[in-house]
Amino acid sequence: MYYCISFTHKNTDIALREKLSFSNEAKKGEFLKIISTHENIEECLVISTCNRVEIVAFVKMACAEFIVKSLALLCDVDKDILLEKADIFEDSGAIHHLFSVASSLDSLVVGETQIAGQLKDAFAFAVKNNFCGVHLSRAVHSAFKCAAKVRNETQISKNSISVASVAVAKAKELADLTQKKAVVIGAGEMGELAAKHLIAAGAKVIILNRDLQKAKDLCERLGVLSEYDSLENLKKYLNQYEFFFSATNAPNAIITNSLIEELSYKRYFFDIAVPRDIDINENENISVFAVDDLEIVVQKNLALREQEARMAYGIIGRETSEFFRYLNDLALMPIIKAIRLQAKEYADKQLEIALKKGYLKKSDKEEARKLIHQVFKAFLHTPTVNLKHLQGKMQSDTVINAMRYVFDLQNNLEGLNQYKCEFDMENNDEIY
């Protein structure tokens, strides 16, 4: 069954989420390797963003305690706290949750579009490292289709916003950004989004990054209202400007009290990274806003999009039902093939017996074979048609199990590709 263990902004604070975050692929790979050794876990992947850590799996039976215990040991967190906080979804609930995540209905900022890329990256990593097979491939592929439907059939992503844009919106509430210089730390996706929104608000931006070439490339994309420098010069900039937006992948805080000088004017720090980049004391001239502090702005966004969200959840509900109908349909075709294969094997076997016992001349073998197969074909025609008519209907699962039992088909099914996936897992370009 499909299985999901979820830690998000809804059930955990940022301090716990940053401990759980997978800031590098090595840690993610280590965790997936650990949990994939469990006898009940067949496939698994991890989605890790600033607002969530999701463990999505295909399992033989529930195994939340093992997964959570493994996560707790790796991240040095109390297992009991995690078990208490975790939201656990099974089977249709897990698929509905995955579709909601992919469609940005479960995001801190409803309608933000970054999550689709983050899910794609998580899936690609799991496929590349052999943690993800056909079951999760189908689920994720269907999640992308669902997300596309939500985007196309609702206005949920119209004028789409992100955590970065919410941070800039909060900055605009605090001061007029026109012609001001704002420092963006980090040249990744979140940093680029923050820079674009700052420029749109009339500000000029300075990009600081450890990799100077990446900072330069970003500035070239942004245009004339930007400049760049090395992260090594961070202290100089921290004590020269008013607005700072930090979005790096650093495992520990990069802006600390030792870098901050006392100044006479007000400075605003927006920490949009998880784990957090900023660990400084606030005072009358220093204000720090982390991801969770932007909740009020987010709630305004949620109210505006509430009607669209209701429509989107309707789509997700229908797509969840359709997904399980699709799985039942996949199971029907091998049943039909197996019955026909079984009939052919019995016919060929009885034909050989008849030849050995002299009931049939060798010269008549082919004609007899054709006749027997025609009889079986005619006999199986109506059952085959009726089975095909069951496709997409709720009772198909019951009939499938009955047919397996009546015809003793379990062994026959093992040789068939009953789990054919609709896209090539080796081709990452086909994932999204």
Swiss-Prot record:
One of its GO terms (biological process) is protoporphyrinogen IX biosynthetic process from glutamate. PROSITE patterns: GLUTR. CDD domains: NAD_bind_Glutamyl_tRNA_reduct. Coiled coil: none annotated. It holds the Pfam family GlutR_N. Its EC number is 1.2.1.70. Keywords: NADP, Oxidoreductase, Porphyrin biosynthesis. Substrate binds at residues 49-52, 107, 112-114, 118. NADP(+) binds at residues 186-191. It catalyses: (S)-4-amino-5-oxopentanoate + tRNA(Glu) + NADP(+) = L-glutamyl-tRNA(Glu) + NADPH + H(+). Belongs to the glutamyl-tRNA reductase family. During catalysis, the active site Cys acts as a nucleophile attacking the alpha-carbonyl group of tRNA-bound glutamate with the formation of a thioester intermediate between enzyme and glutamate, and the concomitant release of tRNA(Glu). The thioester intermediate is finally reduced by direct hydride transfer from NADPH, to form the product GSA. Catalyzes the NADPH-dependent reduction of glutamyl-tRNA(Glu) to glutamate 1-semialdehyde (GSA). Possesses an unusual extended V-shaped dimeric structure with each monomer consisting of three distinct domains arranged along a curved 'spinal' alpha-helix. The N-terminal catalytic domain specifically recognizes the glutamate moiety of the substrate. The second domain is the NADPH-binding domain, and the third C-terminal domain is responsible for dimerization. Homodimer. This is Glutamyl-tRNA reductase. It comes from Campylobacter jejuni subsp. jejuni serotype O:2 (strain ATCC 700819 / NCTC 11168). The lineage of its organism: Bacteria, Pseudomonadati, Campylobacterota, Epsilonproteobacteria, Campylobacterales. The gene is hemA.
